[in-house]
From Swiss-Prot:
Localization: Cell inner membrane
Homology family: Belongs to the OXA1/ALB3/YidC family. Type 1 subfamily.
UniProt entry keywords in alphabetical sequence: Cell inner membrane, Cell membrane, Chaperone, Membrane, Protein transport, Transmembrane, Transmembrane helix, Transport
Family annotation (Pfam families): 60KD_IMP, YidC_periplas
Subunit text: Interacts with the Sec translocase complex via SecD. Specifically interacts with transmembrane segments of nascent integral membrane proteins during membrane integration.
Cell membrane as UniProt keyword: yes
The gene coding this protein: yidC
Described purpose of this protein according to its UniProt entry: Required for the insertion and/or proper folding and/or complex formation of integral membrane proteins into the membrane. Involved in integration of membrane proteins that insert both dependently and independently of the Sec translocase complex, as well as at least some lipoproteins. Aids folding of multispanning membrane proteins.
Organism ancestry: Bacteria, Pseudomonadati, Campylobacterota, Epsilonproteobacteria, Campylobacterales
Protein's name according to its UniProt entry: Membrane protein insertase YidC
Organism: Campylobacter jejuni subsp. jejuni serotype O:2 (strain ATCC 700819 / NCTC 11168)
Length: 528
């Protein structure tokens, strides 16, 4: 039979279950794109439809007669550009065929630097495709000539690589100015007009997983952003007045940007409906470019607007300040793991007044449990009177069954924000914490943190006052630590560390409040 207390308790149980299951299941379904079974290298042959620009050149012809990535061998590299931070290789088609970041965090298990140019996909950065099939075919047969085979970019300098290609009746010149951090400027000139597409490159395809968004985005001159997630592109589109476009995965991105003279951009799709971005022109083309990590400091040093590629989802308004605060703590602490611990403690302190109110209310409900049971028995045949007497009991003793839900509701956006920050922060990659945790961006190799997190959650349940009468609801609550432990096993250690410390704080707070409440209760009973 329904009554007010059961309804309140059911809402609290439902809220806890919804938070756990919706977060891990439905959130991933709606906000994380499905992974393609196989990555194709060709662009769709579909004609451009419903575009925002009527004079967009047809990309169909530009997708034919392009070389397979497998055909581009080491022998085809005509120039190498290096700095302290990166190495770029330019092939005979005038493209960046390989790009390496020279830092330990960008090494694979074999100790080799990761190539940010995906060899399984097309197009490569700075690859040009012409609308005229005959020009396009010839462009992938006649090699470019470079003015230098090796260039080194000083820490405060730049180097210009000049590439030239002479086709039948058409000369193509590419001037690429490289800067130390991996950003560059590209200028293309043709001896006569010819419609062509040029790409910043397919997304790096290095850090692609089921947890994060990957695909492409376009920002116009009003700073309105359109995101195209992998698997979601249904038709070819185009946009004008574009100041920045990027293809990205979890940690890495490739860009074209021009905040002074906006670009015209076409968004095509491959066989798996993944976005492929091209800028297009019929002669001169100028843009800034970047290949590298989505590290905030680097992106901000190039242009703060590039930070838009770091995706935080719906809770960006909370996540961005959270990251800035975490970064601030790291500057003083020098360790990302301990910065996460300190940030969690500070957040818990800020939320303590609400938590305290909730815990006191739960203790009051525990004391009222015998009286509540008596009311249910006395008025079990009259739900209206039962509810009325329950409300009078709550009012008399200052108890509010719904007050326990408010802190949880307020913590939902904070948790989602911290979740997105810790999941997307390249700064945590290869960043150690202490003991056995040598990389906060990957799962705990020994599952110690998830188990500790589950244990603290279980202990918290043991000392938290419960007034649940329904055995089924009680069983569901007991299984929550197991469910959370199971899901967190594969989560990055940084995120699991946050949740473990958060649980530890809750455990300590509950223990202290239980002691305080017990003393107050003892005083009242002694005085009586």
């Amino acid at each position: 039979m329904n009554n007010s207390n059961n309804i309140f308790q059911q809402k609290r149980i439902l809220l806890a279950v919804v938070i756990s299951f919706l977060f891990f299941v439905i959130y991933d379904y709606f906000f994380i794109p499905k992974q393609p079974l196989k990555i194709e290298q060709n662009i769709t042959q579909k004609n451009q439809q419903n575009t925002s620009i009527n004079n967009t050149p047809n990309i169909q012809n530009a997708t034919t007669n392009t070389p397979s990535a497998a055909l581009v061998s080491q022998d085809s590299v005509i120039s190498k550009v290096q700095s302290k931070h990166f190495e770029a290789q330019i092939d005979s088609f005038g493209r960046i065929s390989a790009f390496y970041l020279k830092d330990r965090k960008y090494q694979n298990e074999k100790g080799e630097f990761i190539n940010l140019v995906s060899k399984e996909n097309s197009p490569y950065p700075l690859e040009m495709r012409f609308s005229d099939p005959s020009i396009n075919s010839e462009a992938f047969k006649i090699p470019y000539v470079a003015n230098a085979s090796n260039l080194f970019v000083d820490e405060n300098g730049s180097q210009v690589l000049k590439l030239t290609q002479n086709l039948s009746g058409l000369k193509i010149e590419k001037d690429i100015t490289f800067y130390p951090k991996g950003n560059y400027e590209i200028e293309v000139k043709l001896s006569k007009n010819a419609n062509y597409f040029i790409s910043p490159g397919y997304r790096p395809n290095i850090a692609v997983d089921s947890y994060t968004v990957h695909g492409a985005l376009v920002m116009d001159n009003k700073e309105t952003i359109e995101t195209y997630k992998d698997g979601d592109v249904e038709k070819d589109e185009s946009a004008n007045n574009v100041v920045m476009t990027s293809a990205f995965d979890r940690y890495y991105a490739t860009f074209f940007y021009n905040f002074d003279k906006p670009l015209n951009v076409a968004i095509s799709k491959d066989a798996n409906q993944n976005p492929i971005v091209f800028a297009y022109s019929d002669n001169e083309f100028k843009a800034g470019g970047y290949i590298g990590s989505k590290e905030h400091v680097i992106l901000r040093s190039i242009d703060p607007r590039l930070e838009a590629v770091v995706e935080y989802g719906w809770f960006t308004f909370i996540a961005k300040p959270m990251f800035e605060f975490l970064n601030f703590l790291h500057q003083y602490i020098g360790n990302w793991g301990w910065a996460i611990v300190v940030m969690t403690l500070i957040v818990r302190i800020i939320l303590f007044p609400l938590t305290y109110k909730s815990m006191i209310s739960m203790n009051k409900l525990k004391d009222l449990a015998p009286k509540m049971k008596d009311i249910r028995e006395r008025y079990k045949g009259d739900p209206q009177k039962m509810n009325m007497h329950m409300m009078e009991l709550y009012k008399k003793h200052g108890a509010n069954p719904m007050s326990g839900c408010l802190p949880i509701l307020l913590q939902i956006p904070i948790f989602f924000a911290i979740y997105r920050v810790l999941l997307n922060a390249i700064e945590l990659k290869a960043a150690p914490w202490a003991f056995w945790i040598h990389d906060l961006s990957v799962m705990d190799p020994y599952f110690i943190l998830p188990i500790l997190m589950g244990a603290t959650m279980f202990l918290q349940q043991l000392i938290t006052p419960m007034t649940i009468q329904d055995p089924m609801q009680a069983k569901i609550m007991k299984f929550l630590p197991v469910i959370f432990t199971f899901f967190f096993i594969t989560f990055p250690a940084g995120l699991t560390l946050y949740w473990f410390v958060n649980n530890l704080c809750s455990l300590v707070q509950q223990w202290v409040i239980n002691k305080i409440f017990a003393k107050e209760h003892h005083k009242k009973t002694s005085g009586a």
